[in-house]
Amino acid sequence: MQASNSFSSPDSLSTYLSEINQYPLLTQPQEQELSKRFRAGDLAAGHQLVTANLRFVVKVAYEYRSYGLKMSDLIQEANIGLMKAVQKFDPDKGIRLISYAVWWIRAYIQNCILKNWSLVKLGTTQAQRRLFFSLARTRRELEKMGAGDANVVNAEEIARKLNVKASEVREMEQRMGGRDLSLDAPMGEDGDATHLDFVESESVSAVDEVADRQQANLTRELVQRALRRLDPRERFIIEQRVMGDAEMTLSELGEHFGFSRERARQLEIRAKDKLKLALVTLMAEAGVDESTLNA
């Protein structure tokens, strides 16, 4: 089970994108059948699961184009993440492969980026690493809104969004930069079509919609399963203080159970901590990387 993606020029990337666009997408029943066959030792079924999702992998890899790595390296790591997901995917869970695989894909891409950025460029603290990834994502959002690159001119706005100092944004911006072969680049000298056009289609848009929906469904499922690990009182507190449309005040919560507002606050903190621990545990059991859930 492997996905070939050797390219180092616009033409070779174009050829690769054209090739993967030829692989048919799978319905959920087809996906489940192939997954069961692969788990039974059918490597050809695993290969079909991989190739059917390569277009989606490219679109995820493209989101990380601002980190100065070659698109070929990003796509290669993303493909490895996809293959890992195929190996661990359980078709009996009732979710689509793409919604499960996206966390593996992002995790492998991010790990590749972290390995290739020196500590001098990136910084050594966890906060600096979080800023590293958040900053690029915010830059892409600003570009989509027509605000231009997230450079020093936008430092204050970005700092407010990320809840960091503007000086930290400026420093990280200076560390970042450089792009490789872009999927936005024209395919030919006289053509307006771009490389990304090869992976932009109604079918891929449908895949994206399914992925978003399945990711939301998976998140809701994990939260509900985590809630079931709480006792009835803890569950009530979370439902009324976190998940309810009309949020109970701490005073109302204390009155409901017959204890003080301060005691209600303490129990709320305990319930939230227990829910978080249960959710992290369930994510690990499902093979979902916690750090990629908010990616």
From Swiss-Prot:
Protein's UniProt name: RNA polymerase sigma-C factor
Keyword DNA-binding tagged: yes
CDD domains with a match to the protein in the record: Sigma70_r4
Functional summary from the UniProt entry: Sigma factors are initiation factors that promote the attachment of RNA polymerase to specific initiation sites and are then released. This sigma factor is essential for normal fruiting body formation.
Origin superkingdom: Bacteria
DNA-binding region coordinates: 250-269
Keyword Transcription: yes
Keywords, alphabetical: DNA-binding, Sigma factor, Transcription, Transcription regulation
Family note: Belongs to the sigma-70 factor family.
GO molecular function, a single term: sigma factor activity
Xref: InterPro entries: RNA_pol_sigma-70_dom, RNA_pol_sigma70, RNA_pol_sigma70_r1_2, RNA_pol_sigma70_r2, RNA_pol_sigma70_r3, RNA_pol_sigma70_r4, RNA_pol_sigma_r2, RNA_pol_sigma_r3/r4-like
UniProt motif Polymerase core binding: location: 73-86
GO annotation terms (biological process): DNA-templated transcription initiation
